[in-house]
């Protein structure tokens, strides 16, 4: 039987890389998708050097067709997909009254829409398995707008709502969908370090094997630890 597969969309040097390493350490094969080819290759080769079976594809996550194809190829090659983590967002240093509708839509295309695209790409395989975990990186700006970066909170609020909609719709198929609201700045040596976030994701994936009635759909990562809120 093949190893479980974790697909990381938005596999940057912080949370994405830490999440890939964590699932790799748990015996998962890892598939990486991100726009920066050089960083992606560096992460992929480092995982391979650590003994993790790893594949990667550079891709602009706003390109629905390319992102879908990349994920479908990973699923087809592995014959399964167990965990999907969707991590992208865009920080735009603009106040709300300086932001155009085009700016807002462009940022939603990075920070929200890839969750839907990626989820739809893994659904045929997860439904056939009758199990799977879909996880999305949220942020406290979803309900507490970040000063001077109006679109960030809109991305995260929409992401949470979309995650909850997917959770409701997919639970009957055995698919656990959850979002982690990071209520602080992601930085090493803090309660919001990338490795801490990665462990929360690993714990949520493990929870998928339990009774769906007890699945967490929204959890807050606070300075005091993990708080289930829905």
Question: Regions from the language model: what does each represent?
Answer:
Residues 90, 97-116, 159:
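Catalytic Tyr-X3-Lys loop
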Residues 107, 133-158, 164, 171, ...:
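Catalytic loop of short-chain dehydrogenase/reductase
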Residues 28-42:
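Conserved glycine-rich Rossmann-like NAD(P)H-binding loop of the short-chain dehydrogenase/reductase
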Residues 85-93:
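Conserved NAD(P)H cofactor-binding loop of Rossmann-fold oxidoreductase domains
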Residues 76, 110-128:
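Amphipathic alpha-helical dimer-interface segment in Rossmann-like NAD(P)H-dependent oxidoreductases
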Residues 47-65:
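Rossmann-fold cofactor-recognition segment
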Residues 172-230:
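C-terminal helical subdomain
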Residues 12-13:
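Conserved glycine-rich cofactor-binding loop
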């Amino acid at each position: 039987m093949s190893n479980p597969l974790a697909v990381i969309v938005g596999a940057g040097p912080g949370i994405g890389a830490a999440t890939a390493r964590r699932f790799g350490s748990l015996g998962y094969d890892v598939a990486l998708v991100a726009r920066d080819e050089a960083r992606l290759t560096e992460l992929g080769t480092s995982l391979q050097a650590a003994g993790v079976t790893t594949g990667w594809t550079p891709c602009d996550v706003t390109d629905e067709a390319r992102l879908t194809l990349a994920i479908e190829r990973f699923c087809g090659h592995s014959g399964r997909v167990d965990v999907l983590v969707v991590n992208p967002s865009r920080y735009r240093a603009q106040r709300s009254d300086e932001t155009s509708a085009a700016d807002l839509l462009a940022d939603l295309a990075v920070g929200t829409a890839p969750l839907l695209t990626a989820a739809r790409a893994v659904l045929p395989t997860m439904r056939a398995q009758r199990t799977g975990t879909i996880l999305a990186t949220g942020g406290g700006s979803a309900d507490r707008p970040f000063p001077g970066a109006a679109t960030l909170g809109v991305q995260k609020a929409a992401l949470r709502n979309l995650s909850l909609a997917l959770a409701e719709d997919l639970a009957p198929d055995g698919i656990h969908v959850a979002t982690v609201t990071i209520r602080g700045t992601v930085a090493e040596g803090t309660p919001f370090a990338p490795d801490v976030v990665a462990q929360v994701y690993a714990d949520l994936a493990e929870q998928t094997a339990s009774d769906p009635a007890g699945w967490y759909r929204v959890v807050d990562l606070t300075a005091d630890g993990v708080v289930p809120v829905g």
